[in-house]
Amino acid sequence: LFELIGLGALIGLLLALRISPVRAVIYAWNPLLLVEGWGSGHLDAMVVPAVVGAMWASVAGRHALAGGLLAAGTLLKLYPAALLPLLLGPATLPVLGAFAAGLVLGYAPVASGGLSVLGSLPRYLVEEYFNPGLLRSVVDFPGIEAAALTVWVLWMGLCRREAPLPARALPVIGGVLLLSPNLFPWYALWLVPVLAAVPSLPWIAFTGTLAMAYTFFLQDPWAIPWWARAVEAAPLAAGAGWWLYRRWPLDALAERSA
């Protein structure tokens, strides 16, 4: 049901951006969605309608609704809050007001539970070690990861403010995924609808190679083999290499070094 609602919201967003709704196929037939959403029923599939709906509302100028929908997504999973800076601007007050009100209304019934409302978040940040993100693979310290993620989200909120909202959302979501302490495949579900509006071959391929994380169970003790990690990261590594080549061609670098 939520996948269908998300599809409807995505079509609305594409039409609002004057993009062919046929692009929604990138979302509807993405293997990651079919396996982790339709097949496994992960809660993250419920986040998609809220996130896409928030972007659609923002593009349509319904800023309070955008803030409220983003709050709904944040109540389900915390990571949609990373998109909040993208919704700010001339309509900052309606967005922040609706976002804050949504969080208060959502958490008020369980406020007596104290920190228990955070669920498994502390364990996720400190104890679990499954398919670690880019930074944690090098430096395993939660404080650094949280700081890097905060800086990235705020910086992206200030960059390219004239670009369409999905184009700005793509690097934010990508950064959140790569800087996450643990990258479970279903955590990338909210990336897929954005790829329908802003197609990116490396990121689309990455939603497929994320399945390599399940090789975690092939070894004893459980761990993702190095070759599986390499395959998983290959699309993004290739995309980064191509971007660098386009930005600084080899012949230009040779001329500078001469």
Please place each PLM-identified region on the residue numbering:
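Hydrophobic/aromatic-rich transmembrane helices and adjacent perimembrane loops
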Residues: 44, 82, 185-211
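Primarily membrane-embedded glycan-assembly and transfer machineries that use lipid-linked glycans
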Residues: 1-52, 91-175, 180-184, 248-258
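Short basic/hydrophobic patches in alpha-helices and adjacent helix-turn junctions
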Residues: 13-16, 71, 87, 176-180, ...
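Membrane-helix interface "capping/anchor" motifs
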Residues: 19-20, 60-65, 90-95, 160-165, ...
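Membrane-interface alpha helices of multi-pass inner-membrane proteins
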Residues: 34-37, 53-54, 64-88, 171-178
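Membrane-interface catalytic loops of GT-C/OST-like multi-pass glycosylation enzymes that act
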Residues: 40-44, 180-191, 219-229
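Hydrophobic residues within alpha-helical transmembrane segments
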Residues: 26, 42, 68-72, 85, ...
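Aromatic-enriched
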Residues: 199-258
